[in-house]
Every structure is written in structure tokens, then in C-alpha cells.
Amino acid sequence: MNALAATSRNFRQAARLLGLDSKLQKSLLIPLREIKVECTIPKDDGTLATFVGFRVQHDNSRGPMKGGIRYHPEVDPDEVNALAQLMTWKTAVAAVPYGGAKGGIGCTPGELSRSELERLTRVFTQKIHDLIGINTDVPAPDMGTNAQTMAWILDEYSKFHGHSPAVVTGKPIDLGGSLGRDAATGRGVMYATEALLTEYSESISGSTFVIQGLGNVGSWAAKLIHQKGGKIVAVGDVTGAIRNKSGIDIPALLKHRSEGGSLEDFYGAEVMDAAELLVHECDVLVPCALGGVLNRENAAEVKARFIIEGANHPTDTEADEILAKKGVIVLPDIYANSGGVVVSYFEWVQNIQGFMWDEEKVNRELQKYMKNAFQNIKDMCKSQNCNLRMGAFTLGVNRVAKATLLRGWEA
């Protein structure tokens, strides 16, 4: 089952629990707008290259739509649609006043020069500038994009609409970005882990962890969990996987990787089969890489007692059912990795106010939002007698449904 089908299935289950009628369900599921544009740019060698860009704006009942823009060769409308819908529920669960959107361009960033990426970003912005905006749709970085990409979007958008720093988040600090934004998703994963373990009278300190993915989310999650006393016994990325039952020295590993080293030549651990990473012995498994990595092929072999979904849709539907039967507690992506969108909201607020927060305030407010969201999910689980994933979906869908009905959009 692909991400769109799984997200839609979770939505329908939540809608049934809430007793939403079919007309309202249809209204909530169908995107507000799907945009597909052709972006042709001159390459450095003088030839022309054409790329296809997408933006799906799913729902704006609770506020401006919010979601990343990814540059990846496999960007397709179904995936973008699923991720836009997921953002609608994620922002609602986090209690930030946004709806959901997602976008992307089908390209391979590594095959384009910096100047080609800039031209592509500016052309894409020219095509969609009248459909995004501070109070309409606020993009952010995603796979294959970064703060520099957001700076180009901001600059190009401002040519049409005047200086508008709040039109994108995840910007460089010098252009209105927020302190703490770079670490926000990984920090949110750590706060979510803390909340879950506390609920089960456990703590990060003394627990063992396996982390898949050492990109922005995984590396920050690993660093912060390590700082809290968590013992990370195995990690993996696209180059392979390593383990050390006594615990990996995460600061040393991250320094090693920043200097160009690979996992396999890191001195502080032994190489392991990457296929075994997700079923390695641990208390807490934290997948922070791609979707669908936990499936019917490996779910039955998972030894972790808790799974924290740092990635989007890392657990497919069949794996979810297998893990539930095993008694594994899964903290769903729409809550666990929402730290990024929460701090994006803080950045947007700071831009609108023209007042910058210090990093301590950003982190303090993020912790408060993550704790409150977990409590709200728990309350929903209790009232609906459901697991954490369905509790989170039901919480998000309920908030969006209420906003839709209050606006009179149900017809």
C-alpha cells in the first residue's frame, strides 16, 4: 500500500470513529488545489532542460497551508498528494494554525550546478508565486532543498509582492530564519521520545536505541538522545550500518562524517549488515530515513519495544498490524516528526512580528507544544479506545472537521 492509500485509509478509520458523514469525509479528503507546472531553464552548457513541478494545496480551513518543497527524481503527484494530506493532519495535531500542502520538482539535485538549481527554483517560483503567500501557502525545505533554496524563493517572490520574509520558512538566519530551526525536527523527535517513555515510567537515559538515517533529522535526534543519556547501539545510513553494544560515540561519529568519513571506516563500532539494522536488539527504534522501511518482510522480527517514526510513513499498513499484535508501541509520524513544522510556525510568527526569539525560547516553546500534543493524543486514545496512530489521526481530523463545519464548508 503506497503512502497516499495508507494516509487515506487512516483518515477513513478516524472519520468512522468520529462519526463524520460521507459528504464531510469527501470534502476533507479532496485537495483544495493541485498545481502542475513546466519549468524550462537554460543549463550551463547552453542547452535547455525541462522539469515538471508540483504543488498540492490540501486544506486551508485552519489557516494558511504549510508544507515542504522537495527536489527528487521520483517526485510524483500521488506522493505529493499524500504528503500534503499528511501535513493537514500533522499541523492540526501540533495545534499550529495551518493547513497542509506539499510540493516538489522532478529532478536530481546532484546533477545540477548551483546556478542551474537557482534558475530552476526561480522559474518554479515565477510559476506559482500568485498561489503561495504569507496568508495562503507557506513553503519550507524538504528532501533535496535547503535554506538557500528558500532564500531564492523569497527573493523571487519579493520581486512580485514586495519584501515578504514570512512567505517561506527554513530560511537562512540572515534573511529572517529562526534560531533552532535546523535542529527542530530532530529535537521534536527527542521530545516525543521523552514524552512516550515517561508515559511508560521509563526514560531516555539508560534506554538503548537504534537510529536509521543520519540526515538532518536522524543526526540531530541521535545527538540529542545521546546528550540525554540514551545508549545508541546501532545506526545506519545510505552507505551502510554499524553497531556497538556498549554505545556509539555519537559526537565522534558525526564529526567523522562531517570530515568526509563513512560509517564503515568509523573506528568506534563494527560494521553490520544494513538489512539487520531495523531488527537489531534495542528498546527504541527510530527510523529517520525513507518511507516503507518497516513492512511485512521484517516487522515480525523487530525486537524494539517502542518505535518513534522520525521519517514520513516508515511503517506500512501490514507492518502496523504485525507490530500491534507483537505489542510494539508505535509513535506515529504525524506527531513524532512535527517539530519542524512547529518551529516553522515560530519562524513565521517572528517574521510577522518583526521580533526575533532567542534559541532558548524556541526550544522551550517547542517542548511545550510536543508535550501538549502528546497529552491530547493520549486523551483521544482513551476516549476512542484506539492506538497512538489512530489517536493522532482522530485528533487531527476532528480539529480540521470542526474548522470546516464552523466555516460552513460542509455542503
Swiss-Prot record:
Pfam families: ELFV_dehydrog, ELFV_dehydrog_N. This is Glutamate dehydrogenase 3, mitochondrial. The gene is GDH3. Belongs to the Glu/Leu/Phe/Val dehydrogenases family. It comes from the Eukaryota. Its EC number is 1.4.1.3. It is an enzyme of class 1 (oxidoreductase). It catalyses: L-glutamate + NAD(+) + H2O = 2-oxoglutarate + NH4(+) + NADH + H(+); L-glutamate + NADP(+) + H2O = 2-oxoglutarate + NH4(+) + NADPH + H(+). GO terms for biological process: cellular response to nitrogen starvation; glutamate catabolic process; response to alkaline pH; response to salt stress. Induction: Induced in shoots and roots after nitrogen (N-deprivation) and phosphorus (P-deprivation) deprivations. Induced by alkali stress. Up-regulated by salt stress in old leaves. InterPro entries: Aminoacid_DH-like_N_sf, Glu/Leu/Phe/Val/Trp_DH, Glu/Leu/Phe/Val/Trp_DH_C, Glu/Leu/Phe/Val/Trp_DH_dimer, Glu/Leu/Phe/Val_DH_AS, Glu_DH, NAD(P)-bd_dom_sf, NAD_bind_Glu_DH.
